Amino acid sequence: MKKLVILMSLLVLTISAGAANKPWDNGKLKVSDNQRYLQFENGQPFFWLGETGWLLPERLDRAEAEWYLQSCAKAGYNVVQVQTIDGVPAYNIYGQMSNIDGWNFKNINQKGVYGYWDHMDYIVDMAAQHGIYIGMVCIWGGLVKAGKLSVEDAKKYGTFLANRYKNKPNIIWFMGGDIQGDIKPEVWESLATSIKAIDKNHIMTYHPRGRYTSAKWWSKASWIDFHTFQSGHRRYGQRMGNKDYPIPDNTEEDNWMYVDSTWKFNPIKPVLDAEPSYEDIPMGLHDANELRWKDYDVRRYAYWSVFAGSCGHTYGHNAIMQMLKPGYPTSYGDAGDVKTWYQGLKDPGFNQMQYLKRLMLSFPYFERVADQSVIQDNGEKYNRLIATRGNDYLLVYNYNNNNMKLDLTKISGAKKNVWWMTAATGQLKYLGEFDSKVITFRYHPQTSRVEDGVLIAIDSNKDYLKKDQTVLSPDGYKAKERDLNE
């Protein structure tokens, strides 16, 4: 009997652990009152930390999908962006296709067949078990551009998707898919409104072409809840012959500027970089002999964007986003690209994004603003410092270990406690207590390579961090959020 009681207790604990602490336990996702962030219905903040798993539905089997999603959760990701279909029809690893009767889904569920959409259901449900939202890019933009989806078919497809997934707790809808919004806009409008007419539970956005923000075309659209931009994969000066260039020359890596350009459109909505440069992908994408983006590059993109005001960030990896494995060709590289998606999970950038999420959730969330007035004598490009702050804390990201001349009077308190956080490890080092005035700080790196990080200054009357604290808590700031008007 005693053994039975112990076994039953363990079973209850296992079930409870599996069922507890899911993000949607806080309610549905919504836009914050100040229109700049995402939150849950109960008022808790949602910091978007996305992973790019474009070909997950097509290339991974059930066991692989589970391992991948488990790895994402362990690394702190709470969103995985996928291409729901990348062909008309699309085929998955089991040889099943997405469209067995065109855009008529009446007989899509075939008895005794583990179909394409059954596998998609499995992925959505497995993600839910790990507390992850699936960012469903409904159809890739190139297919719409090629005329594979008409306005009427978009209504059918949107109705099918909405009815199938409206009651799943972990769906975020994406229109677009690497495409400008003025290409077949009537199709995107039809697809989006068809879904929104049925599904009242989930938020929606649009994934644009590189170097664009969705606000350029959809700022007034009734269906879009928040914006995304794609800062893209080019280095400074890598224009690559484009005639119509939507950004100033030599600003390709300045993804922080897209936050400002998005907020020039009204009404203001939350925004994030849904596709920055991917770790280990050739700069500019198409030349396998080019240099590749490293972990410190993807960290820079993440901190620059978020400190500029983004409501989160999406990371990507060349091998993972393609789900590369033996038997599949690479789209961005050459025959010498032998790194698999599961090897990519071990790369440093994939595992370092979680420290940004921990940092942003360690302080009162909704009062945070971008504030470059904190910084004096700032530089450009890689030497540019970027600052964000609340009422009683400020954060300054430093990519190049430059001197930081900072105005500590921008936040409350006669004295400020100051820490340095190493972006690659999340390690904290207490630097001391300082008077509230303009002070020049310099963090001395321990190595010759890039050792980027964040200077953290907090009103000494506040206890968001402890002086002897060496890592940030994954639980974040748990106190009730302050009234924005106080």
Task: Tell what function each PLM region has.
Residues 22-238, 246-249, 253-254:
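Active-site mouth of glycoside hydrolases
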Residues 44, 267-271, 278-281, 294-432, ...:
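Aromatic- and carboxylate-lined catalytic core of secreted/periplasmic carbohydrate-active enzymes
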Residues 1-4:
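Positively charged n-region of N-terminal signal peptides that target proteins for export
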Residues 439-441:
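Short strand-edge motifs at loop-to-beta-strand transitions and within beta-strands
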Residues 6-9, 300:
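Sec-dependent N-terminal signal peptides
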